[in-house]
Amino acid sequence: MADTLTLTDNRTGRSYELPIQDEAIRAADIHKIRVNASDFGLMTYDPALVNTAACRSRISYIDGDAGILRYRGYPIEQLAEKSSFLEVALLLLDGELPSQAGLDAWKATIHDHRVPPARIQALFDGLAEDPHPMGALIAAFGALGTFYPEAHKINDADVRRRQICRIIAQAPALAAYAARKRRGEPVVPPAEGLSFAGNFLHMLKATPGQRYEPHPVLERALDVLFVLHADHEQNCSTFAMRSVGSSNADPYSSVAAATAALYGPLHGGANEAVLRMLHTVGSLDKVPAFISSVKKGEGRLMGFGHRIYKSYDPRARIVKQVAEEVFAVTGVNPLLETAQELERIALQDEYFVNRKLYPNVDFYSGLIYEAMGFPVDMFTVLFAIPRTAGWLAQWEEMVCDPETKITRPRQIYTGADVRDYVPMTAR
């Protein structure tokens, strides 16, 4: 059986045999279908690129029907249990699990680059009195590139690597700066002897001049959440990273663009929306009425459903377990029972089952963050810190891909036909 698709253009009666590779046909082959030589050629219309593969990638694999997520072939369940964020970041970048020597060298490099340039603090001082941390983080990533003018040499592998290390290493400090700026507090430098996640907690929570020692369970929980959020195929922010990067922009500009995409409430703000929903529902006895209102179209069950996953999000199962470990330390979030009852009903109710609405990674993560003392406006920042690793792995893959061209989609024009300008006096 040939791996081809035969199309007949009923406008002309001509048939075309299009090759199928990796369950896809090339848009360029569709473009060859035309009525006459002067015709532009056939286009595909795909708003939001729902069924369009814009690249080939070796980084993340998702099977939405089976609820599978893998980084570089490794199941997310194994990485969350056995690995660490910094090891996963290196895996995403290099494609293989590192040796102990390789991991130690990587950690040393991250350590050496973890403090942003001193003058970057002045940027935060120039912002509004209480800027949203995501807005401040976007500005910081964009400004960071001005301190490293070599960054525009994106075709130099050594230069690329230095910028990748700097961005991943400095993301926690920039995020902590943004949070402390909103609270009107001075910045706290990183401390020695703490993990990547632990140092972020120190820079965020410490009193100036004093060391903050994170609880090991909470430190590990945050690291696991960083692993779960490190990459997720071609989502909105990753596509923004690739799209801006395709113009040969430096990685700082591309990361700023990706962070801006993540700032959108339809992308990075989902766990915040879940928490607000749970606060709105309130007590356990109000769950049935809320479910009824959702089924009537009067509200939305936040944290359920996903563009890709049509079964249980594998990350959600891990987050649920992490939540139990965190609550054993912090005490149970009073909204946990409400969340569990919403999940129980939704997994049994035909309305949600038939629509394949299952819990996603955001359903329980907001409860964890709240229990750990993070303000709601930091939730998306906690998404952005680890996602820098995925963004940069995707960016470098794009830079090295010989098929890469500057992103330039087509449109279907629906505006006015040609018309003559009318002078103001004649309108």
Predicted regions located by residue number:
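Non-transmembrane, aqueous-exposed alpha-helical and coiled segments at domain scale
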Residues: M1-R427
